[in-house]
């Protein structure tokens, strides 16, 4: 909505433009009227719409044509004033003033126009019959107001309607020639209807209508008012009310009726409450809510956010199988202005779930959102949510102080979402590793083979706490450039034990990106069921890890009838959670011993602190 309104008064000489302005300001008819009034600014706190309003007069005797065009360009709305007792001034509206304001062209945005019939005290019958054909001819005319500067009749109403034409314009909402909502308006209202239809039965119950009413206007409808609304709809629209509930057709009819009766501010209130701008597009503030993350901190969804996401999944999971099919996903995202994830994410994302049907995925969540990295600040999946729930979800994102001011790898992380990059040469088994994370073997490759799964997400328990671990498959050769992004919470460097060259590639990536950093790394020897190949020149994998003070390579295989071991995934999550315990370790036992000792040390410290507290209390 515009932050200020600039009203320009035009019209023939002696029609009363200046008198109207002075009567508004002085609240009395001026005995002496100057040729032109100075520009007047009405403060925001004394206007009904709470916006500052500038009122500008025009005098053909004092201003040039160039000055007039400049004022028209700056005007938010133009009031064309005519004398109801002089028919020639009415005709000038059509032949002179409207073409002058909007250039006589039908292209581009048009300045809204208010027709003002002044001196109604001289013609009691009014002039509406003469003006109606003009209003029908020019759609930019918002309304016509008859008034009298002498009797102070409808003076305040005149400037109120001028404000309203700017702040709540009719043109984007309604086509007066077709007498129906414009497509963009109907589309926006349809989206709002779907968001308000919480039980997804294609109709708004009394409870949903009152929730919608409270969301938009701050209070519910009285029971009788609610019945009156449904009665009006049922009398005018076939199928507008079904089973005592308002359908989409009925909802659209109500808004059309508001506009036709001059109450388009009601429809604008609804649209703006759900994030729409004057051009009927979702505003940047709605699409990209501000999220400030202080240095040394990250942001994650708290349990309220996860509960909300779970409720959305359950709401759209029509067959109650614990997963969303493509059709159910389409239903969920039908109210979104665009895809909730970027092009880097596949269309089918594997995830452990109850459903065993192909091409079924859970409620998608962008790893960037979960991790609180830059993608989180863009909040790409918030725009489609209904306003009250959207606000609740935005509030569920909280700042989590990690004590990691020096970056990943320093101290224990308190985050619940961890990113592991699985790096390795093509063919070493990265995709199988991701499938094994989800409990799938080699014979259970879901999804089209031409669309490999880049991400896999599941929960892992670390020290009795549940963590979300995201595995991201990355081709190792893509990280051989210095500018490549290798950042993560833990790196999984995978090589084929039967292919010496695959280990050499992993070793190169380690030296380039991780050797001098603090990110914990774990080498994994895949296809451990196959015979080892020839030893590569130089250090063996075990010697390489010992030389660089890394944990010994972990053997992994997806072959065999049994599900692959999941211990390696718990280990990766633990390394990401306790990165300071990983570096300098030469074997697995030492690492897990430190984890255990850390937990025991914390418990001992707590007991000693409590004992000291009891001694101090007794001494008092």
Curated annotation (Swiss-Prot):
Transmembrane segments: 595-617
Residues that coordinate or bind Ca(2+) 2: 317, 319, 321, 328
Keywords: Calcium, GTP-binding, Hydrolase, Isopeptide bond, Magnesium, Membrane, Metal-binding, Mitochondrion, Mitochondrion outer membrane, Nucleotide-binding, Repeat, Transmembrane, Transmembrane helix, Ubl conjugation
Coiled coil: none
Entry EC number(s): 3.6.5.-
Mitochondrial intermembrane topology ranges: 618-620
Top class in the EC scheme: hydrolase
Residues binding GTP 2, per UniProt: 427, 429-431, 527, 529, 558
Chain segments carrying region Disordered: 340-364
GO molecular function, one term: GTPase activity
PANTHER family linked to this entry: EF-HAND CALCIUM-BINDING DOMAIN-CONTAINING PROTEIN 7
Protein name: Mitochondrial Rho GTPase 2
